[in-house]
Amino acid sequence: MSPRPDIARQRPDILCIGSVLWDVIGRAPRRMALGHDVPGRITRLPGGVAMNIAAACLREGMRPALLTVLGRDSEGRALADACAAMGLNTDHVTWADDLPTDRYMAIEAENGLVAAVADAHSLEAAGDRILAPLSDGALARADRPWTGRVALDGNLTLALLEQIAASPLFATADLRVAPASPGKAGRLLPLLGHARATIYVNRVEAGLICETLFDSAEAAARELVDRGARRVLVTDGSAPVAEAAADGAFHVARPPTVSVCRVTGAGDTFMASHIAAEARGEQGAAALEEALAATALYVSSA
């Protein structure tokens, strides 16, 4: 679905809070291992967990707004222009004179992600400054909190996620939460038991949160619910995806078989597509199937 050009001027129906940065991705059409130096293609495009979720929501016809920080530098201005050209709402971005625009660098090959480094230090340094639109009246305020959907990404600091978990500003929001990477999965612990949170993780991230090795998404999803999660969705690459909830609901779906051309942003696309499917009224296995189909299309397109 192509985004309408006026969509950024409409009131948002989902807030994407977290990293918006430049993705620098090197891709090689062969298998790679540590130390390999091979020919390929290097691209730069807008990225970051919050950005990827917003872009996928936009493709699904939703109206996302970005809450993040950008440096008031040439890279930040170019990134904001690129987001606006896509149709994303950047009205509530925090601009920083003292911080550079964040970046992410990854190497992908035929055998998947080889290595990646995320430099999200400016987002971490900005802290709760990026949440100002939720209390100053721009989007909401303390006596009229945001009641819509919110996508939170694990690039936010543990302290800020703890603050969000306890904040009345988010008490009535539909929270959707994803770690930025396995290394940051532990940051989601403050939100694990939140009464309005849905957690999206992969099998490895679930294992790090639970300090357990899981052999399937199904086992990981059940354990996360046993540990207090209200609802959780666990992916596992090409293996089945599982959804479990504290009310006993449990669903499993298998991803379509496709040739994988890219992996960066796949988890974010799954999360956004699932949110969009539920916004359209789909539930349970039907919403999972729609999200998996959208993700398969994403990873199989260059």
What function would you assign to each model-found segment?
Residues 22, 34-36, 44, 59-148:
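Conserved N-terminal subdomain of the carbohydrate kinase-like
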